[in-house]
A protein has these predicted regions:
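NTP-dependent small-molecule kinase module
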Residues: 10, 15, 23-27, 44-115
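A short beta-strand element within the Helicase C-terminal
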Residues: 4-10
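Contiguous ligand/interfacial binding patches
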Residues: 26-40
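Conserved nucleotide-sensing/catalytic segment adjacent to the nucleotide-binding pocket
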Residues: 1
Length: 115
């Protein structure tokens, strides 16, 4: 392979991918299954695609010149790779809190129901 002069890593959060699956705006990688059941698309992404792509992403992390955030449709944001890595370094060296969410669709969520 020929390496380019600049590496732009385009990123989309898994939550946004799930939302686009639901709206039939996104298919699984190279499959063209826009109209397939959302749960099947999500499980394929969760168990196959995201595992493979996470490994690939690790090799690109130190090399990327820019990170392109594609989470807001038609409104991408871009930051220099060095600035992104510096922000991550700062984030992991101070307390932070993740915001939990519950998505009942994929794994059932029956235990949350009041019987």
């Amino acid at each position: 392979l020929i390496e380019g002069d600049i590496l732009v890593y385009a990123d989309m959060a898994r939550w946004e991918i799930q939302q686009r699956f639901r709206r039939k705006e996104l298919d699984n990688w190279g499959v063209g299954n826009f109209d397939e059941d959302v749960l099947k698309k999500y499980k394929r992404a969760f168990f196959i695609e995201w595992r493979v792509l996470d490994r690939h992403k690790k090799g690109l992390f130190e090399k990327m010149d820019y990170l392109l955030d594609t989470n807001i449709k038609n409104d991408p944001k871009m930051v220099k790779g060095d600035a992104f890595r510096a922000a991550l370094t700062q984030a992991v060296n101070q307390p932070f809190r993740l915001v939990p969410f519950f998505d009942p669709g994929v794994w059932g969520g029956q235990w949350k129901k009041v019987v």
